[in-house]
Design a protein with these regions (language model features):
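Core SAM-dependent methyltransferase catalytic element
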Residues: 101-124
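Residues lining the SAM
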Residues: 33-38, 62
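Class I SAM-dependent methyltransferase SAM/SAH-binding core
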Residues: 1-23
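Conserved beta-strand signature within the Rossmann-like core of class I S-adenosyl-L-methionine
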Residues: 56-69
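Short alpha-helix
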Residues: 77-93, 97-100
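A short, conserved alpha-helix within the catalytic core of class I
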Residues: 40-54
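A short acidic, Gly/Pro-enriched loop at the edge of an enzyme's catalytic core
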Residues: 21, 25-34
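Acceptor-substrate binding/catalytic loop of class I
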Residues: 69-85, 106-108
Length: 124
């Protein structure tokens, strides 16, 4: 958090600690030019994340996918994306720039799904 706070001070980035799963959505109706999510999956947040991306904003999302149970944790299907799930999340609202559903070898073997998508139009 210290490194992030230092970056925020110089780059105009706002940092926030929030419980995204058990508390109210902490960002209200705000929208952002970009949202990056890594190694995290709580499906009920998908609509909130999508709605929080401004017109022509970008979503970059990468997390573990089905098949990862072969390599270790996470292995619970609740924490693994289903095939094509990120494509479904952005369908009809975003233009997909890049998408992968694959096995990686570094930093350790894992199945991941990743997407970079741009919101079409001027707003949510």
């Amino acid at each position: 958090m210290e490194a992030l706070a230092a970056l925020a001070a110089t780059a105009g980035i706002e940092t926030r600690v929030a419980d995204l799963e058990n508390a109210a959505w902490p960002l209200g109706e705000r929208s952002f030019g970009a949202i990056v999510v890594t190694n995290y999956l709580h499906r009920p947040l998908f609509p909130r994340i999508v709605a929080a991306i401004a017109g022509n904003g970008v979503l970059i999302y990468e997390t573990f996918a089905a098949g990862n149970e072969r390599f270790g944790k996470p292995s619970n299907p609740d924490f693994l994306l289903r095939p094509g799930e990120l494509l479904d999340v952005v369908a009809g609202k975003f233009r997909v720039i890049a998408y992968e559903d694959l096995q990686i070898g570094e930093p350790k073997p894992a199945m991941v799904q990743r997407i970079c998508a741009m919101r079409s139009g001027v707003g949510p």
